[in-house]
Amino acid sequence: MTQVTVKELAKVVDTPVERLLQQMREAGLPHTAAEQVVTDNEKQALLTHLKSGHKAKVEEPRKITLQRKTTSTLRVAGSKSISVEVRKKKVFVQRSPEEIEAERKREMDERRAVENAARQKAEEEAKRRAEEDARNQPAAGQPASAPAQPVAAAEPVREAPAPAAAAPAPASAAPSADARKRDEQRRPDKPRADDRNARGGDGERKNAPHRASVKEKAPAPRVAPRTTDEESDSFRRGGRGKSRLKKRNAHGFQSPTGPVIRDVAIGETITVGELSAQMSVKAAEVIKFMFKMGTPVTINQVLDQETAQLIAEELGHKVTLVSDNALEDSLAESLKFEGESFSRAPVVTVMGHVDHGKTSLLDYIRRAKVAAGEAGGITQHIGAYHVETERGMVTFLDTPGHAAFTAMRARGAKATDIVILVVAADDGVMPQTIEAVQHAVAAGVPLVVAVNKIDKPGADLDRIRSELSVHGVTSEEWGGDTPFVSVSAKMGTGVDELLEAVLLQAEVLELKATPSAPGRGVVVESRLDKGRGPVATVLVQDGTLRQGDMVLVGSNFGRIRAMLDENGKPVKEAGPSIPVEILGLDGTPDAGDEMSVLADEKKAREVALFRQGKFREVKLARAHAGKLENIFENMGQEEKKTLNIVLKSDVRGSLEALQGALGGLGNDEVQVRVVGGGVGGITESDANLALASNAVLFGFNVRADAGARKIVEQEGLDMRYYNVIYDIIEDVKKALTGMLGSDVRENILGIAEVRDVFRSPKFGAIAGCMVLEGTVYRNRPIRVLREDIVIFEGELESLRRFKDDAAEVRAGMECGIGVKSYNDVKVGDKIEVFEKVQVARSL
């Protein structure tokens, strides 16, 4: 008999020693150390213990599924056989004794509860019948009540005394029993009360036919009026059944007896579908009504307030006009703030014609090289800077002077307190100078005229004063109220006097602001930065703007994540008259949008969504109105050639300026259509849009990403980059000129006068002519003029000089001319030789 230690046994069975010792202790063995010896009997005992424990853990299967499959062959006509396979499946579930006992108890409890309910119901039914018989007995009379007593006396004695009220009126039991039988046949799921009745139910069932025969022989007044199955069923169920019966018999919908007048709320704009929904009529009814009025509409068409009011009133509804600006009014009320006001720095806008030195003047004031960084040396964005001078702080807005930036200059005049009008002394008043004066007058902003480049020879200040006085700008030297300052942005001459004049105007205006109020301002510029998202340059006009504020900017909103000054340095807050860049908006706002700080995000989101919806509705209504107005004008005309453009820019202001400038190009035959535009780089979606609309991709100070470049290369799209606005406009003009085609012009080459007429057997009438002007060429189109009136137009067929064919004959020489298919040449006629030349057209 081999003996091993606990340690060796653990190694053999591949288990830890500690676990083996624990199992041996559970098996009742006395081993406690790894060196103790284990006999064969102890091994057997340990094995038996482990097997029993394993069997206890493994549960017997509680569900057995038996499947049986039989196959048979079915013969059909045509000696064909079909195999039919029948599958049967049975599932046997083994339940534990506890579950069986619990199920048995539950069934007994349910049976007992059903019997108690049936007994109680039978007692109530008997009591009710007794009460009904008692009520009907006086009306029935004595003759009818006599035969009932023997039947009641002959009723067998039950084992237990039944309720006293069950004895009278046994004749009425049969009808109720018959009614119950009919009810049970009609509703088989309802348990029968007779089967679950108390003791004596069998005797009652045996006597039921006899009682029925007695009832048939009884006089009619003895029996209560018969009820329908539903009524008897409702009586057995009690009062609750009566209410359910009434509910079941009641109609679900009652038709209105007259027209329903509804209150219809109509805003500034409403679609046909929304109007019909408010009136609870089909949209087809509204469309039919509009057709009768002579206006074809669709279900999604936007109606104005007056039209919608007319439709609703004609259809008989009550109209309530709603102001769509209620939300805006509540916003304006919430933004009111009262606090202590302090003086603020003036906001000065520098305006003038292109290349008159606006940015160079600001460059000298700021002591920074800004003009050198602009593409082409011209300003194409609004630049906002604040400068600390010896006399105080001044905020400058530098606007572009190019003709395309009209809207941008108008925004600059709107957001400013004082306008510096820069006029070059050597160039004088130019178109954009006059436009800047008009913007300043329209905004009610005082002007300070800076006559720049006075260091150049040929500067004439009196000429500039005279030209500006024509447009209502009169200098103080001439008795007006506009200060004129002579400056030189290159040398710095007169800059201090200019700043002094600006600050003097600011003192007269008494500019005030409340720094403790929530921030409020205007968007100067906006762009889409690839790394930082939408970035907006904001000029704070009142209050203090802080990092973390919830701002509403036009139809965009967001929480300020960061603020940067004009030098790109982060700042925590910005007071009045300070320009800053803010990050955190959900989109790029339009330049000129007002910015407000709100208390909560919910209000900001609500107003932003309202403004977006309102802008969309107004845009759709305007577009549809334009289509209806132009439908008759364009009828019968040839379709214009269109140059489609997808335009992407670095900032919102430049995008608007380019869209306006390009949209103004064209004539009656060609036009420019900007099918897509946005702020940011050229993306893959822009390239797909250009491909779908057959458009040209223009990038202004932006570039295309890898996906867009791949599509452009694969599809052969035309994509161009620009950084100067002149180049875009010139290229688009050239493209439109190429689309115009060419004009056909006629150049008169020579004129010959007929001096004599000869006859030729080959050519017919030959005109002997003297060439008066130019040169006469063979095989060129000609006109025959008689008394300066064209009588024939054809081709010069034969040209000879001294009986020899000639290719051309110059002025002062004689020649013979044969006109093809024309023989009515007379002396004194003139023959005009010309050519048709195609000439390129221009806009």
Curated annotation (Swiss-Prot):
Give the highest taxon in the source lineage. Bacteria
Where composition is biased (Low complexity), the residues are 136-177
What are the boundaries of the region Disordered? 94-259
Q: Which UniProt keywords apply?
A: Cytoplasm, GTP-binding, Initiation factor, Nucleotide-binding, Protein biosynthesis
Q: Where's it found, cell-wise?
A: Cytoplasm
Where in this chain does the record put each tr-type G domain?
Answer: 343-512
Molecular function as annotated in GO? GTP binding; GTPase activity; translation initiation factor activity
Q: Where does GTP bind?
A: 352-359, 398-402, 452-455
Presence of keyword Thylakoid = no
Q: Where is this region: G2?
A: 377-381
Residues of the region (G3) are 398-401
Q: Which InterPro entries match?
A: DNA-bd_dom_put_sf, EF-G-like_DII, IF2_assoc_dom_bac, IF2_II, IF2_N, P-loop_NTPase, Small_GTP-bd, T_Tr_GTP-bd_dom
Q: Where is this region: G4?
A: 452-455
What function is annotated for this protein? One of the essential components for the initiation of protein synthesis. Protects formylmethionyl-tRNA from spontaneous hydrolysis and promotes its binding to the 30S ribosomal subunits. Also involved in the hydrolysis of GTP during the formation of the 70S ribosomal complex.
Q: Per its record, how is this protein called by name?
A: Translation initiation factor IF-2
Q: Which organism is it from?
A: Pseudomonas savastanoi pv. phaseolicola (strain 1448A / Race 6) (Pseudomonas syringae pv. phaseolicola (strain 1448A / Race 6))
Q: Which gene encodes it?
A: infB
